[in-house]
C-alpha cells in the first residue's frame, strides 16, 4: 500500500495533533513535551506509516506503563510526576536520533518504505536498522524501569551485583530484564506487521525480515543493559536521609551508593540509544 508524501503529511499533522493534545491533557507530556512530540510524530508519519507506528508503540505503551503502580513509584522515585509529564528534552532524547535517521533514510529512498536488504542498499539497511535499534532501546529501557521497580525482588547493581535500594541507577532485576526483552520484541513485531502493508520485498528477502524480531528483542535487552552500566558508573546515585529516597545529586545529607556525577538521566538515555542504534545498524547490514 503505497501512499504519497503529501497524503502522509496531512495524515501526520492530524494524528500528531490529536495524540499530542490528548497526551498533554492526560499529563503524559507537559506543554513543551506536547509541542516536541507533535513535531517528531509529524516527521515520522510523513516519512512512513511504519516509522510512525514504531514511535507510537513506544510512546503509548511507555505512557501506559508509567501510570501503573503510581503509588509505589511515588514512594521510590524522587523525580516522580503524575502521569509522567515528559518535557521537550525527554521527548527529543527518546526520538531525536530516530527523527534524523528517518529523514535521511527517506531522502535516499525517495520517501518509499523499503525492506531490510543489504544487497539493494547497505546504507539504507543500516539506517533502518538504526531506527529499529533506537526504539527497541527506548522501549526496553522504559519497560524495564517502569515494571522493574514494581518487582518485589531486590535490585542488584549491574557492575558489582551487590543489592541496592530501588531507584538506584544501574540497579537491575530479572523482571526488568525480561520486560526489556519483551519491549524489544514488541518493536520488532510492529515493524514486521506494518511492513506487510507498506513495503514489498522479493520472497527470499521477505523471509529474512522475520529476523527483525530476535534482533529487536536483543536490541531492547542490550539497550537496557547499556543504560544500566552507564547509570551505575557515570550517573550519581545516593541515599538522602532527609527525603528517605535515592537521589541523583550529591549533598550533605546524601550517602553515595554508586556512580560519579557526569550525566543525568536524559544524558544516559541519549548515549545508550546512540550506542544501541549504532550496534543494531551494523548488525542489520550483516544479517540482512
UniProtKB/Swiss-Prot annotation:
One of the record's GO cellular component terms: plasma membrane
Expressing tissues: Expressed in the vasculature of leaves, roots, inflorescences, siliques, anther filaments and sepals. Detected primarily in the phloem tissues, including in the root ans shoot apical meristems.
Pfam families: DUF92 (PF01940)
InterPro entries for the chain: DUF92_TMEM19
Free-text function comment from the UniProt entry: Involved in the glucose-triggered developmental leaf growth process.
Family: Belongs to the TMEM19 family.
This protein's UniProt keywords: Cell membrane, Membrane, Transmembrane, Transmembrane helix
Lineage of origin: Eukaryota, Viridiplantae, Streptophyta, Embryophyta, Tracheophyta
Segments forming a coiled coil: none
Induction of the gene: Up-regulated by glucose. Down-regulated by STKL1 and STKL2.
Name of the featured protein: Protein PGR
Location(s), subcellular: Cell membrane
Residue ranges of the TM segments: 1-21, 29-49, 91-111, 123-143, 177-197, 210-230, 268-288
Membrane topology summary: Multi-pass membrane protein
Amino acid at each position: 500500500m503505497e501512499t504519497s508524501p503529501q497524503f502522509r503529511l496531512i495524515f501526520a499533522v492530524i494524528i500528531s495533533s490529536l495524540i499530542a493534545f490528548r497526551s498533554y491533557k492526560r499529563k503524559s507530556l507537559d506543554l513543551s513535551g506536547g509541542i516536541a512530540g507533535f513535531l517528531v510524530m509529524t516527521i515520522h508519519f510523513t516519512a512512513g506509516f511504519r516509522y510512525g507506528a514504531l514511535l507510537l508503540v513506544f510512546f503509548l505503551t511507555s505512557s501506559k506503563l508509567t501510570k501503573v503502580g503510581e503509588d509505589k513509584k511515588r514512594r521510590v522515585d524522587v523525580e516522580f510526576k503524575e502521569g509522567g509529564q515528559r518535557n521537550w528534552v525527554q521527548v527529543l532524547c527518546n526520538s531525536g536520533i530516530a527523527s534524523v535517521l528517518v529523514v535521511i533514510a527517506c531522502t535516499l529512498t525517495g520517501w518509499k518504505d523499503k525492506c531490510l536488504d543489504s544487497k539493494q542498499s547497505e546504507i539504507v539497511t543500516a539506517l533502518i536498522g538504526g531506527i529499529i535499534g533506537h526504539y527497541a532501546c527506548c522501549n526496553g529501557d522504559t519497560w524495564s524501569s517502569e515494571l522493574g521497580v514494581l518487582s518485589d525482588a531486590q535490585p542488584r547493581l549491574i557492575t558489582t551485583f551487590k543489592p541496592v535500594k530501588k531507584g538506584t541507577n544501574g540497579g537491575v532485576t530479572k523482571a526488568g530484564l525480561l520486560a526489556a526483552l519483551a519491549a524489544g520484541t514488541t518493536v520488532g513485531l510492529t515493524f514486521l506487521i506494518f511492513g506487510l502493508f507498506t513495503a514489498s520485498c522479493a520472497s527470499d528477502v521477505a523471509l529474512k525480515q522475520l529476523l527483525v524480531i530476535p534482533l529487536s528483542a536483543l536490541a531492547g535487552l542490550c539497550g537496557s543493559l547499556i543504560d544500566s552500566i552507564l547509570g551505575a558508573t557515570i550517573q550519581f546515585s545516593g541515599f538522602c536521609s532527609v527525603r528517605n529516597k535515592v537521589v541523583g545529586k550529591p549533598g550533605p545529607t546524601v550517602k553515595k551508593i554508586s556512580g560519579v556525577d557526569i550525566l543525568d538521566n536524559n544524558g544516559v538515555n541519549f548515549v545508550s540509544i546512540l550506542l544501541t542504534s549504532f550496534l543494531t545498524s551494523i548488525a542489520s547490514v550483516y544479517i540482512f
